[in-house]
């Protein structure tokens, strides 16, 4: 539960910056932490759900419900075809994860490696073509947590390196100039996403307090806060 609440709070900060409180960069810096946590929770949800069809169905339902609120908040329009909400990113990712799990059942190492490699390529291409939130980088982030789920020191190191490359090199973007020891250094704003690894690594796979109503709140938060922010922009 704590990871969900953290992710919701960080996402709200980022969306406040992107809609009604521009210029407060600290909001988007800490907001970068949200997506990797959600990506991690998506993978955990895949493995812990009691009914995969219902799990995917809920995400699909809220992806549809969130589209207009997302368009209003991020595009100031009911129709915003150049950017889709993050739940579509998650649906694509779940499809690729499920494909890999089916390949695992076959038991052949070569097939698992082949499907894994094709999944990374498909995630990259489909993420760009569909223009889902975080594009190719978002889907690859989910796959990083899927392929490196072993909770070993080497998987943690690989997660760090992969997320560093995805956020620092692949996404890049705006950077802050720092003076350190007489040298100029640049810190990429998107790089703050790596801070998400600390609470993720502390996760021990134990579910906290859970209820049906709390689950509904988690899902409703995304479209509702976007709708509110989108409407405030027009006031």
Set out the residue ranges of the language-model regions.
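Alpha-helical transmembrane segments and their immediate juxtamembrane cytosolic regions
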Residues: 1-235
């Amino acid at each position: 539960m704590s990871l969900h609440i953290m992710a919701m709070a960080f996402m709200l900060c980022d969306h406040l910056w992107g809609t009604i409180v521009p210029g407060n960069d600290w909001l988007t810096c800490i907001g970068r932490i949200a997506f990797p946590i959600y990506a991690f929770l998506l993978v955990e949800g895949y493995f812990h759900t009691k009914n995969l069809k219902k799990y995917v169905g809920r995400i699909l339902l809220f992806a549809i419900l969130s589209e207009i609120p997302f368009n209003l908040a991020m595009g100031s329009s009911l129709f915003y075809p150049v950017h889709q909400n993050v739940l579509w990113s998650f649906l694509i990712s779940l499809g690729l994860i499920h494909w890999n799990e089916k390949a695992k059942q076959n038991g052949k190492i070569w097939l698992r490696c082949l499907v894994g490699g094709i999944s990374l390529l498909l995630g990259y291409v489909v993420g760009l073509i569909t223009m889902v939130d975080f594009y190719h980088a978002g889907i690859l982030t989910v796959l990083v947590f899927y392929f490196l789920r072993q909770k070993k020191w080497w998987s943690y190191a690989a997660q760090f390196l992969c997320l560093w490359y995805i956020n620092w090199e692949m996404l890049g973007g705006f950077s802050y100039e720092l003076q350190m020891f007489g040298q100029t250094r640049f810190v990429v704003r998107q790089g703050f996403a790596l801070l998400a690894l600390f609470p993720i690594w502390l996760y021990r796979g134990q579910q906290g307090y859970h209820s049906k109503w709390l689950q509904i709140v988690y899902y409703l938060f995304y479209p509702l806060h976007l709708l509110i922010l989108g409407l405030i922009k027009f006031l």
